[in-house]
């Protein structure tokens, strides 16, 4: 009976008895049930994680599509604004050039009018001077009624020719 003197034998006997008690009490069913529950919970968590991952992927794709659309719209707006700015600049330049041309024509016409007026004033002053000189010369050289008649006719004739 040396076999019963060994500690390992008693550990093995105790283990077999303990397993028998566990089998009698149905502990193995409880352990299996707990493992099954844990497996189901892990599977549900994995399914939920997979579903969340799919939703996140869809949201990411949607976000990228919206961002791309927004970038295209922004580029279109910028292009439209540039085109509008160029068009407005061209219109403004054309209007400014037209304004300068009109102002130049107005200034030229005013200058021409002033030149014509100055020329007319000079001619009138020259005519007055000629008439006055002729009147003085005639009055000093001719005397009497004949002188007055000649003087009047001469002044009238000079005025009509010079004006």
From Swiss-Prot:
Topology of the protein relative to the lipid bilayer: Single-pass membrane protein
Locations listed in the record: Cell inner membrane
InterPro entries cross-referenced by the UniProt entry: ATP_synth_b/b'su_bac/chlpt, ATP_synthase_B_chain
Keyword Repeat listed: no
Top-level taxon: Bacteria
Keyword Transmembrane: yes
Regions that span the bilayer: 7-27
One Gene Ontology term of the molecular function aspect: proton-transporting ATP synthase activity, rotational mechanism
Keywords, sorted A to Z: ATP synthesis, Cell inner membrane, Cell membrane, CF(0), Hydrogen ion transport, Ion transport, Membrane, Transmembrane, Transmembrane helix, Transport
GO cellular component, one term: proton-transporting ATP synthase complex
Family: Belongs to the ATPase B chain family.
Protein role: F(1)F(0) ATP synthase produces ATP from ADP in the presence of a proton or sodium gradient. F-type ATPases consist of two structural domains, F(1) containing the extramembraneous catalytic core and F(0) containing the membrane proton channel, linked together by a central stalk and a peripheral stalk. During catalysis, ATP synthesis in the catalytic domain of F(1) is coupled via a rotary mechanism of the central stalk subunits to proton translocation. Component of the F(0) channel, it forms part of the peripheral stalk, linking F(1) to F(0).
PANTHER family linked to this entry: ATP SYNTHASE SUBUNIT B, ATP SYNTHASE SUBUNIT B', CHLOROPLASTIC
Oligomer and partners: F-type ATPases have 2 components, F(1) - the catalytic core - and F(0) - the membrane proton channel. F(1) has five subunits: alpha(3), beta(3), gamma(1), delta(1), epsilon(1). F(0) has three main subunits: a(1), b(2) and c(10-14). The alpha and beta chains form an alternating ring which encloses part of the gamma chain. F(1) is attached to F(0) by a central stalk formed by the gamma and epsilon chains, while a peripheral stalk is formed by the delta and b chains.
Protein name stated in the entry: ATP synthase subunit b 1
């Amino acid at each position: 009976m040396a076999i019963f003197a060994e500690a390992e034998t008693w550990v093995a006997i105790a283990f077999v008895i303990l397993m028998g008690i566990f089998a009698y009490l149905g502990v193995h069913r409880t352990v299996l049930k707990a493992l099954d529950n844990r497996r189901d919970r892990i599977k549900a968590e994995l399914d939920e994680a997979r579903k969340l991952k799919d939703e996140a992927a869809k949201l990411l794709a949607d976000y990228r599509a919206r961002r791309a659309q927004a970038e295209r719209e922004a580029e279109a707006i910028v292009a439209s604004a540039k085109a509008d700015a160029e068009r407005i600049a061209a219109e403004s330049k054309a209007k400014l050039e037209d304004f300068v041309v009109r102002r130049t024509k107005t200034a030229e016409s005013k200058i021409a009018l002033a030149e014509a007026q100055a020329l007319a004033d000079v001619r009138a002053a020259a005519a007055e001077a000629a008439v006055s000189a002729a009147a003085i010369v005639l009055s000093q050289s001719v005397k009497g009624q004949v002188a007055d008649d000649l003087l009047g006719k001469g002044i009238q004739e000079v005025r009509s020719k010079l004006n």
